[in-house]
Amino acid sequence: MHLNRVLRETGVVVAAGLLYGSAAFAQSSTIIGTVIDAQSRQPAADVVVTATSPNLQGEQTVVTDAQGNYRIPQLPPGDYTLRFEKEQFKPYARSAIQLRLNRTIRVNVELLPEALGEVVEIVGAPPTIDVGSTTMGVNVDQEFIKRIAVARPGGKGGATRSFESLAELAPGAQNDNYGVSINGSTSPENGYVVDGLSTNDPAFGVNASPLSIEFVQDVNIITGGYMPEFGRSTGGVINAVTRSGSNEFHGSVFANWTPGTLEGTRKQIREEGTVITGQNQLQNLGDFGATLGGPILKDKLWFFAGFAPSFTRYQHTRTLNALRVDDEGNTIKDETDFTVADAIPGSARKYYADSRTIQYMGKLTYLINQDHNVSFALNGTPTSTGGLGKLSVNPQSGGLPGVLATRPGDFGLTETKANTTSLALKYAGAFADKKVLVDANLGWFHQTASTLPGDGSNLGDRTGLAGYSRMVYTTPRALTLFEALPEGQEGACGSTPEEQLVRSPVTGYGVGGPGFMSDQTLDRYQANAKATYLLNALGTHVFKAGVDVELLSFDQVKAYGGGVFFQEGSNYGVAGQGPAVHDARRYGYQTGPDSAVTQFTQVAKTTSTTVGGFLQDSWSIANRVTLNLGVRYDVQALYGGNGDLSLLLGNQWSPRIGAIVDPFANGRAKVFVNFARYYEQVPLNLMDRAFPGENRISARRSLAEPGQGTATSCDPSSFESQQATCNTDSNLLAIPESSRNVNRFYTGGTVGGTPVDPDIKAQSSDEIVVGAEYEVLANTRLGASYTHKDMNSVIEDMSRDDGNTYFLGNPGSGFAGEFPTPVRNYDNVTVYLNRTFADGWLAQANYTWSRLYGNYPGLFRPETGQLDPNILSDFDLIELLENRTGLLPFDRTHQIKVFGAKEFNISNALSASVGVSYRGSSGTPINYWGSHWAYLQDESFVLPRGAGGRTPWINTIDSNIGVNYRVSKDSVVSFTLDVFNLFNFQGVNTVDQTYTLRDIKPIPGGTPADLENLPGRVEFQDQAPRDEPFGSVDGDVNKNFKNPLSYQAPRQVRFGIRYTF
């Protein structure tokens, strides 16, 4: 280290700078360091070290020990000033120390004797390497947020600018259906923490609180390598701490607006097999609100409050088309091999999808004395979308309406509401001169979620929308069979039924009521406490131990409109029985053979109790080696709808072992390795569906074409026929004797719980992380890491008798030994360069190579969007197990993320900043999906995973421009302009992977060549035989297969204005 002696009046030097230490996802941070005599180079004992910050009530004071070491724990993140004082030394104050969330930073100091007239000054910037931790991830604060375009409009939490959206900034992270996938896991596997308490949905595991980044001070995205203090997550952790008051009144008034008029052109989605097109266009999206914080009693009692409504409106244009034909009546293809279609004049109809959220929060922080404080926080996020005649924005995924292949008047039938309320009480205390620390949290996270009929009818009613069943026709039919064409265009699709089928085919067309509906109430009661003890013995030990308890409950009423969801299906291959309609989903039971009873609602309240504890030690040796050692134990008891204990998951021992070496002992480099085992906390949806099991019955009925119902044939397009013929036994089709049990017409209906393997093991994954970092320039570090993750035991339901009965176990072991072992192997190599914001600019860049391979995607099925943790369809049926091993849906071989920003000071009052970001990623695997006679669409892998190649690369460039004008000393007006997808790239996000809607068998180990020269190469499933070979009937192969289903979100421009005081 280069030293330069200069004469000076002050008498101190900061020697080792800021050395980032242990990171975890608690809600406070720590400053540590060593103080020495600059002349004698000996430790300086009994030096008084005082920390102050605008975010800290009062001040925190400690005294150095005999070795000159000090530790100031339980600090909120913020900018700090440290004062060092002792009689024989000149006093010193070091300011502008940035302490981020969940960090331990080191500030080493050399004090000069009072009599010495010169000071030893260090030339160069302090190191920025985190030498005490193996934790991987990124920390996002308000400094980054205001300079880089983040929280893209649209998507989940888009209008609210949810803290969860920041997770995709981390290397190895990507957006998935319900949030952000981290290192190959699915979003419900992540832990979501706000102010020390979980915001995970107790039933499904996803983040349930889209809390605005306006209310958040820091967000820490942990991708792996964390200590045993934290568990119940097999993915990453998104940890946020909300803002607090201070000794000065401060606040903001803000507004953000994304107008649809400036949106880039959306590429039209063209679908084969249907003449209905749909286009979503943003109308308005934004949020506005205010925050205020300050003292009620200075240095004693602070408050912070915020209020932020947000709104979203999309316009969906539904258009009817007619296929163009030649002189011989054959359809015409264009140069891209799409069938040429002409829009029918006057057919375009506009519908609106609205979403509204009101967010609020309040927080009180009380300082009992210097060593003890408590805080209480309240926040809520009520959201509503849809309504009668309106479309919905899915609150769980942010998904927009797809093509409305549904009869006009039969969509826009429900209103969806999602409301969360969180209460959190936190205590932090220090004893024995801050050698013993105690932290405790107590909280309640309450949710209501419902999708109910828009006309006000109640679930289970036989009248109104609640009594109206949904029907889907899977075989191509003429549009004119369901809808009247605009006046004057009656002949646009032809004049005969045959011509109309050629020129206006629709596939997967829906009629009827709202389908599945539910009304849910969920609660998560949480309590945890931990104690930390600092010991100097053969180095420095930070021992920590703790316990925590979580009580979950899930109360749900669920129903299908009219008591049943109909879908066109096979007639069992019996000649003369004609077309069939399948009771695809009907709740009910049987009191005897063929004595079915329909349940118009199913009601269940399920609960869970989880108790855990941990012990860990972070042992630092000679400022060169740190060993992080610990173990965690959890046990979860789950209770079914009858109140009985249904599943007990113990023996959840989670070892965590890490080592960090600082080879030069100067904080400018590190090499590290870590092993960890993580266990899942099973969400309650499993209990709701399986304990006792869902009572479902199924049958097939004689299907009448729309408008042609009779006393013995069901016309589900008619409400009257649904209420009469479709719910009687007069139109039932007999099950072939070869597959018949005691029932001639019905399957299912068995009442009872799901058997559980007595040796079932909790679900877990293992992780190994190896990496190195080196500070190549001041504030700039270069790093590389390798991560491997794989699954141990997985909990899933399975069936040996074609779905008549199910049991719960670990596929591949125990009672389920003949089922394939779940595999999800993830390998990741990341190279990154990070420059923290300094000297007016920041830069971050990372490249990730990864591979995700196996037969188990996670806690939801990306293929169908099925969100049923631990009870997915992947291992249900033996006949569907073929071809499921391969590259998994979120396998992206390459990912590149680059962020940069520069700030310009134009005058004392005026400044500006420019930020640019680039994200690029390779495509995802394409599959060949088929249908299943009982599980319906996209449940069968006709060919092995990934046999269809990959989707294209996706490239996105975003920009940020900010202008700040200082009105007075403490008030600033800011204007921001965020442009997302600056060049309006329209890369293909997803393609249609439905090869067929027919119930065909997988081809084990097959290739695309096996599907050439149809018919005759593919077999139908045994329960859905057909006389005509597959490929001989129009509609057997999906005409839209591999065509784009979605493109990148277009260019969107967000304006922001803010007054801060």
Swiss-Prot record:
It holds the Pfam family CarboxypepD_reg. It is found in: Cell outer membrane. Gene3D superfamilies: Carboxypeptidase-like, regulatory domain, TonB-dependent receptor, beta-barrel domain, TonB-dependent receptor, plug domain. Residues 121-243 form the TBDR plug domain. It is a multi-pass membrane protein. Belongs to the TonB-dependent receptor family. Residues 248-1061 form the TBDR beta-barrel domain. Residues 701-722 are annotated as: Disordered. Residues 1-26 form the signal peptide. It comes from Myxococcus xanthus. GO terms for molecular function: carbohydrate binding; siderophore uptake transmembrane transporter activity. PROSITE patterns: TONB_DEPENDENT_REC_3. The TonB box in the Oar plug domain is important for PopC secretion. It comes from the Bacteria. Keywords: Cell outer membrane, Membrane, Signal, Stress response, TonB box, Transmembrane, Transmembrane beta strand, Transport. Required for secretion of the protease PopC across the bacterial outer membrane. Binds and probably transports PopC from the periplasm to the extracellular milieu. It derives its energy for transport by interacting with the trans-periplasmic membrane protein TonB. Required for cellular adhesion during fruiting body formation, a multicellular developmental program that is induced in response to starvation. Residues 709-722 have a biased composition (Polar residues). SUPFAM superfamilies: Porins (SSF56935), Starch-binding domain-like (SSF49452). Disruption phenotype: The deletion mutant is impaired in PopC secretion and does not accumulate the intercellular C-signal protein (p17). Disruption of the gene results in a severe defect in the development of fruiting bodies. The deletion mutant has a growth rate similar to the wild type and displays normal type IV pili-dependent motility and gliding motility. Interacts with TonB. Part of a transport system composed of the outer membrane transporter Oar, the trans-periplasmic binding protein TonB and the inner membrane proteins ExbB and ExbD. This is TonB-dependent transporter Oar. GO terms for cellular component: cell outer membrane. PANTHER family: OAR PROTEIN (PTHR30069:SF46), TONB-DEPENDENT OUTER MEMBRANE RECEPTOR (PTHR30069).
